[in-house]
Amino acid sequence: MQQRRPVRRALLSVSDKAGIIEFAQALSARGVELLSTGGTARLLAEKGLAVTEVSDYTGFPEMMDGRVKTLHPKVHGGILGRRGQDDAIMEQHHIAPIDMVVVNLYPFAETVARVGCSLEDAVENIDIGGPTMVRSAAKNHKDVAIVVKSSDYDAIIKEMDANEGSLTLDTRFDLSIKAFEHTAAYDSMIANYFGSMVPAYHGESKEAAGRFPRTLNLNFIKKQDMRYGENSHQQAAFYIEENVKEASVATAQQVQGKALSYNNIADTDAALECVKAFNEPACVIVKHANPCGVAVSTSILDAYDRAYKTDPTSAFGGIIAFNRELDAETAQAIISRQFVEVIIAPSATEEALKITAAKQNVRVLTCGQWAQRVPGLDFKRVNGGLLVQDRDLGMVSEAELRVVSKRQPTEQELRDALFCWKVAKFVKSNAIVYAKENMTIGIGAGQMSRVYSAKIAGIKAADEGLEVKGSAMASDAFFPFRDGIDAAAAVGVSCVIQPGGSIRDDEVIAAADEHGIAMIFTDMRHFRH
């Protein structure tokens, strides 16, 4: 659909001034008459642009500290007026057609994110006239272009140049969708913020704001369609947050390989979030959202080599994550040794990418280096509802550990215990992790009974010929019975780290003492379902 509409008059009113001067100059140079409000009008005038204040156009001044600027029939009539149908009524009331509206809204999100933001500050940063103009222009996209993103400025000018100052209906329709997405996200933000304040507002809570609003509104942007979902008979797409604040699979750039699958993305997320837990050079290998090998060392090459040794069978077709730049030597080791679906790292050298390029099926992602973990929400869909919780960013420090056994752990046991405790947080419950000298040697995941996870971890270690004697064992939750300790002792585990909290803690501790095992309580559980 090419129905073109010339742009002869534009109304500009923006809070975010990025790029607006250049855009306005480009419009003016193409003969577009400029209308504007408040600070935007002053800025354009300072730059020497011919601009008409909306208050001069309407004959009605801005009032109430700027609360009422554009809510006027001469503004909305000019936007909503249907060309060829409402021309007579527009002419009768001296309403000039407005062909383009350039608006972005008061910075509500930035305002409420500030420490000490008052209710009054939040209220004053709720835009009224802006969303009204945006919706009016989007509704009348048949005749009017609505621009809410500065990233569209250049493309709009290029299209106008290619079409003698006009924009096509396809473009106007696309811009209208962006506009409705913009106002939906804006209203959702406001509803979420004030919805979370209801208990405090009514005196039911001393907290200024709750974590969870009474109505949860979510806005995600489609990044890509998937060939299929978790299984081939399911359709799927990948949606991301608009402003992701932490390096993640959502922000990662694919620099090589075929399109990511649904399962690739889920597994890559699991691998990346696990490797973020370590400060030393680390490697995490994941299969079906569970770590099957994790290690830290002095280099990512050695970390990969040690992680792979945990379970070479499961590593086949897995996802590999690093917390350092992927170098050529490590890339060569991976490609020479195994089939891998995805490699993700903060960055990759040119030499490394040349090596991985030899395998067209290998997907390589770079996500940038991360600083600290960003608090947020986790969601779990259930039939008819959504479970919402804070992200599990908890991790105990060495100073917070409690030794509850008669024997104290050695320095090496303590290091291994802290290492496998970090890993256990990312293994599906019931989770048991055996580790020795900064590498996993056996992982038992997702079993319905904790003792069987412990047994499986021992079996995996034995199958790979890894020495369990003197290793540490981590459990993501408490041991309900002593049988898990007995199973660990039978294969040579010498130190156990677990949350504690069972009604049979005394029996479990007694079992550790019987076997001469050092036992550490974290007082923090890490279920993962």
From Swiss-Prot:
Q: Where is the MGS-like domain?
A: 1-148
PROSITE patterns given for it? MGS
Renumbered to this chain, the signal peptide range is none
Q: Please name every pair of cysteines joined by a disulfide bond in this record.
A: none
SMART domains registered for this protein in UniProt = AICARFT_IMPCHas (SM00798), MGS (SM00851)
What catalytic activity does the UniProt entry give for this protein? (6R)-10-formyltetrahydrofolate + 5-amino-1-(5-phospho-beta-D-ribosyl)imidazole-4-carboxamide = 5-formamido-1-(5-phospho-D-ribosyl)imidazole-4-carboxamide + (6S)-5,6,7,8-tetrahydrofolate; IMP + H2O = 5-formamido-1-(5-phospho-D-ribosyl)imidazole-4-carboxamide
Domain text from the record? The IMP cyclohydrolase activity resides in the N-terminal region.
Q: What is its EC number?
A: 2.1.2.3, 3.5.4.10
Among HAMAP family, the record links this protein to: PurH (MF_00139)
According to UniProt, this protein's pathway is: Purine metabolism; IMP biosynthesis via de novo pathway; 5-formamido-1-(5-phospho-D-ribosyl)imidazole-4-carboxamide from 5-amino-1-(5-phospho-D-ribosyl)imidazole-4-carboxamide (10-formyl THF route): step 1/1; Purine metabolism; IMP biosynthesis via de novo pathway; IMP from 5-formamido-1-(5-phospho-D-ribosyl)imidazole-4-carboxamide: step 1/1
List the GO terms this entry assigns under cellular component, sorted alphabetically. cytosol
Question: Matching Gene3D superfamilies, A to Z?
Answer: 3.40.140.20, Methylglyoxal synthase-like domain
Q: Name one GO molecular function term.
A: phosphoribosylaminoimidazolecarboxamide formyltransferase activity
Is-annotated flag, keyword Isomerase?
no
Indicate the family of this protein. Answer: Belongs to the PurH family.
Q: What is this protein called?
A: Bifunctional purine biosynthesis protein PurH
UniProt keywords (A-Z) are:
Hydrolase, Multifunctional enzyme, Purine biosynthesis, Transferase
CDD domains of this UniProt entry?
A: IMPCH
Q: Which GO terms describe its biological process?
A: 'de novo' IMP biosynthetic process
Classification via InterPro entries: AICAR_Tfase_dup_dom_sf, Cytidine_deaminase-like, MGS-like_dom, MGS-like_dom_sf, PurH-like
